[in-house]
């Protein structure tokens, strides 16, 4: 047992930090774009302004400098605190998780849409969906809004909860959680700058997310499968995910849809004429029934069951030290 003792202690600290961060976030949720977020965005713009000279390798350099600096400072502080007090190092982990992980960063959008659909207030549901996606939803019907809300929630739960949790559990200290969220943010800020006018500056930011998110995407999908209808989730994952516009996030969406037995994807319509005009041609993923307000509750249940599953796995490792 002495050989595995460091891993058991690490699992205990990880589990307790995750529980504390989730509880803190429920009591005092952070705004989506608070002062810390605005400061970080300004810092990334500063790095881009000084390192983007129109070449692909400048994007590589900017990404490595940004990630390397953040990880060096955070991990250095963690190990320095660990020499002083385990409690201080644990508190730093809780703080980093509080800043990088949480349901409340996206759940208010989902909950408000769920309430609007349940009340039959389509106009309010459209307005809320448009605000969440950053695109007009004025022509969408209730079924399309339900599908989009479920898709957005499954994607956000991966990016804000499971991806962070998995990387935090993989690397000691706060480095994994910070690396994951930073990679997503760099893709958001720089990933679209791949054209000739930018010299391919954003290519590496996109590639880095593919590498960093490869395992978490599949573990999130596996968690959904175990927490829901396993057979349908695996079937949809294997047969539908690759045909989604982004095959990687398609893994999470297909598995999640199969797990709760709902059909997602499918074209969105502008509502002109009896059948409408397709404005966003998307393949159908999932299996079972058409999406409606009731399936939004099923989505919440699936995400929470999957989270409990991962926490139980960490708890088993932690308890192993006493057996």
Role assignments for model-derived ranges:
Residues 2-323:
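Hydrophobic N-terminal alpha-helices or hydrophobic patches in metabolic proteins across all domains
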